[in-house]
Structures are given as C-alpha cells and as structure tokens.
C-alpha cells in the first residue's frame, strides 16, 4: 500500500509543483526567481502552475524550466521525462497553422481595394479637368462675342471706336490739341462751349463799309483776324459786364486757369499696355465707350458716377478714378473677363 501511494504521489508531482517546492525550501520568492532568470513574474507563476502559454513555443518553455531547475538545484533528468509526457497534451492544444491560400485571398482583396481607389482618383481628376475645360470654353466664347460686337460697332462707325456721349460732356479729354496763336503768343483754350468765338462770327459782326468811303482792305483784314484770335481766348467770365468801363481790357480770372482741371473731376483715366476690348456705362445708362483700344493709348472718360466697366483683358490696362488706382489684381489672377463698378460711394 505504501508503494502504490508513493507512486501516485510521484505521478501527481508535476514539474511546476516540484519547482515550487524547491523554491520554497530555499526561501526564495517568485519575484526573486524572476529577477535572477530575467523573466516576468507571470511567467514564473505559469511554470509553477503548469500553465503553458499559447503564444510561447515549447522550446522556450523547456528552456525556462531547465533554467529554473538549475537555480533551485533540481536534476534535469527527473523533470524531462515528465515534460515529454505532457508534450502530446500541449501539442493537441496548438492551433493549426494557416494555409497560404488565406494569405492569397487577403492579397487579392487588397488588390481589388487598391484598384477601386485608383478608379475613384481617376474619376475625380477627369471631372476636375472637364469642369476646367468647360469654364475655359465659356470664357473664350464670351470674349469672342464681345469682339464680334465691337467689330460690328467699328464697322458702323467707319472703323473708329467713337464713344457715345453728350455734345457738352468731356468724354475724351484732348491731350495733344495744338493751342491757337494770337500775335505770335500761345493763347490758352477753355473747355466752355460758350466761350469760343470763331473768326467767322467776328467777321460777321464787323459792320460793312459803303463803297463811297475808301477803306484799306489789307488793314481791315489784319484787324479782323487779330480781333478774332483775341476773342477766341476770352472766357465767359472775361466778357465785359454792364457798367464796367469799356476802355480797359478785362483782367484774366482764376476760371481761365483751372477750367481744364475742373473737367477732370469724377473722370476715369485708362492707360493701355496692349490691345483690349472695353465698355464703360455711367449711372444714367449711357454708354461712354465701347470698342477696342490699341496698346499705348490713353483714354479719359467723364460721366455720372458710378461707372460699370466690362474689360476683356484686365491685364492690358491700368485704371485710375479721381487720381486713385483701381485694383484689378483678382481679375488678372483669375484670367477672366472683368466686370466691376467704379465710383460707388
């Protein structure tokens, strides 16, 4: 009976139990054993409880047990037969290895996913390109329509762009008009429509002499031309008023010097660096200018503010309103027809 009991006790003593008993007999703790073997405390606990870790290979597990046995002075020959008996049981618990077909399925699925992603990217790029092309074609068609309208207006005006303004409005300020000369001296011109008196009007106002009186025709003509040239330089403010002495010549007033600058108040000044189609409409709906201007031209327009401008090529000109520059940078960067309102208070 004692022999059978000892055999049962030997069989029931697993490697973990024997290692734990040897550790306790030496007075060591699990923490001490773990530090000496450079293992985790949980690994030492699993070895003593005979719990094989699923993610740990059997080779490493046996190596840990051998190191543990050497530390607590247990012979390896007593533990290895017990480990060999437990090996089939542990081998049955090992999960089967995945086949290569599963990896191929994953790769195939990843390939389809990448193909679908590239397809979406190509569709987005195609739609973006189509949208840009449609906008570009619409802009080109709009510019071509403006050019056709301008060409039709040029053909009606005899090939010259003529701004549509009132007779008394200074739509285009003359810049290179020569000044008249009286007695060898330049005479300033004024912009008042009622201040200019022509030579023919002066001539008609001279009373005709009768044939009975001898008249020196040469002196008469010279006097008439001198009077006509002098009267052309007289502004309305210089006309003698009733009650003023007629013997003294009228003095020049301040209106004669500032008449040219007064007409530029509220005016638009445009300097063209290249050929450009332009249309300007004032607040009354009157078209001040509509046509093509050549590069190097300077256009001065005056009307009732605000002005509505349509510019075919914003980068081909610079605009200033009342001496202040007008910003066209956003239209130049967008490379499109500029539609803006200038002079809004």
Swiss-Prot record:
Parts of the chain that traverse the membrane: 112-132
Compositional bias of type Low complexity: which residue ranges? 229-241
Cell membrane as UniProt keyword: yes
Segments of skewed composition (Polar residues):
188-225
Which stretches of this protein does UniProt put in the Periplasmic compartment? 133-345
Classification via InterPro entries:
Bact_Cytoskel_RodZ (IPR050400), Cro/C1-type_HTH (IPR001387), Lambda_DNA-bd_dom_sf (IPR010982), RodZ (IPR023690), RodZ-like_C (IPR025194)
Q: Which Pfam families match?
A: HTH_25 (PF13413), RodZ_C (PF13464)
List all topological domains (Cytoplasmic): 1-111
**PROSITE patterns given in the database record:** HTH_CROC1 (PS50943)
Q: Which SUPFAM superfamilies match?
A: lambda repressor-like DNA-binding domains
What keywords were assigned to this record?
Cell inner membrane, Cell membrane, Cell shape, DNA-binding, Membrane, Signal-anchor, Transmembrane, Transmembrane helix
Query: Where does the HTH cro/C1-type domain start and stop, copy by copy?
Result: 19-79
Could you tell me the superkingdom of the organism this chain comes from? Bacteria
Which terms in the Gene Ontology molecular function aspect does this entry carry? DNA binding
Question: Keyword Lyase, does the record have it?
Answer: no
Q: List GO BP terms, alphabetically.
A: regulation of cell shape
Where is the stretch described as Disordered?
151-260
Subcellular location per the Swiss-Prot or TrEMBL entry: Cell inner membrane
Bilayer topology: Single-pass type II membrane protein
- Look up the record and report any one GO term of the cellular component aspect: plasma membrane
* Family, per entry: Belongs to the RodZ family.
Comment text on domains: The helix-turn-helix (HTH) motif in the cytoplasmic domain of the N-terminus is involved in the formation of spirals to maintain the rigid rod shape. As this protein is anchored in the cytoplasmic membrane, the HTH motif may contribute to protein-protein interactions to form the RodZ helix, which is localized beneath the cytoplasmic membrane. The C-terminal domain may be critical for determination of the rod shape by probably interacting with enzymes required for synthesis of the peptidoglycan layer, including PBPs in the periplasm.
Quote the function comment for this protein.
Answer: Cytoskeletal protein that is involved in cell-shape control through regulation of the length of the long axis.
- What is the protein name for this chain? Cytoskeleton protein RodZ
Source organism lineage?
A: Bacteria, Pseudomonadati, Pseudomonadota, Gammaproteobacteria, Enterobacterales
Q: Which gene encodes it?
A: rodZ
């Amino acid at each position: 009976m004692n022999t059978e009991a000892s055999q049962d006790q030997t069989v029931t003593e697993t490697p973990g139990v024997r290692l734990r008993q040897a550790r306790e007999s030496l007075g060591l703790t699990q923490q001490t054993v773990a530090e000496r073997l450079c293992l985790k405390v949980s690994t030492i606990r699993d070895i003593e409880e005979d719990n094989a870790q699923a993610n740990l290979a059997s080779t490493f597990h046996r190596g840990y047990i051998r190191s543990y046995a050497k530390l607590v002075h247990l012979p390896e020959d007593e533990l290895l037969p017990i480990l060999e008996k437990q090996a089939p049981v542990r081998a049955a618990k090992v999960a089967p290895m995945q086949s290569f077909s599963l990896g191929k399925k994953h790769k195939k699925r990843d390939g389809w996913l990448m193909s679908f992603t590239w397809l979406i990217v190509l569709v987005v790029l195609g739609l973006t390109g189509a949208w840009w092309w449609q906008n570009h074609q619409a802009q080109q068609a709009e510019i071509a329509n403006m050019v056709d309208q301008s060409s039709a207006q040029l053909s009606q005006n005899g090939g010259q762009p003529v701004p549509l303004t009132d007779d008394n409005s200074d739509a285009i300020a003359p810049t290179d008009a020569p000044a008249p000369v009286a007695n060898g001296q330049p005479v300033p011109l004024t912009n008042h429509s009622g201040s200019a008196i022509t030579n023919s009007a002066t001539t008609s106002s001279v009373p005709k002499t009768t044939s009975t009186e001898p008249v020196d025709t040469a002196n008469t003509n010279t006097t008439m031309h001198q009077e006509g040239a002098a009267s052309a330089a007289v502004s309305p403010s210089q006309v003698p008023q009733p009650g003023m002495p007629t013997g003294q010549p009228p003095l020049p007033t301040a209106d004669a010097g500032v008449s040219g600058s007064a007409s530029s108040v509220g005016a638009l000044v445009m300097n063209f660096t290249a050929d450009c189609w332009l249309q300007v409409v004032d607040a009354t709906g009157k078209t001040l200018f509509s046509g093509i201007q050549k590069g190097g031209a300077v256009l001065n327009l005056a009307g009732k503010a605000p002005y509505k401008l349509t510019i075919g090529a914003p980068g081909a000109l610079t605009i200033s309103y009342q001496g202040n520059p007008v910003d066209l940078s956003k239209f130049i960067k967008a490379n499109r027809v500029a539609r803006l309102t200038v002079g809004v208070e």
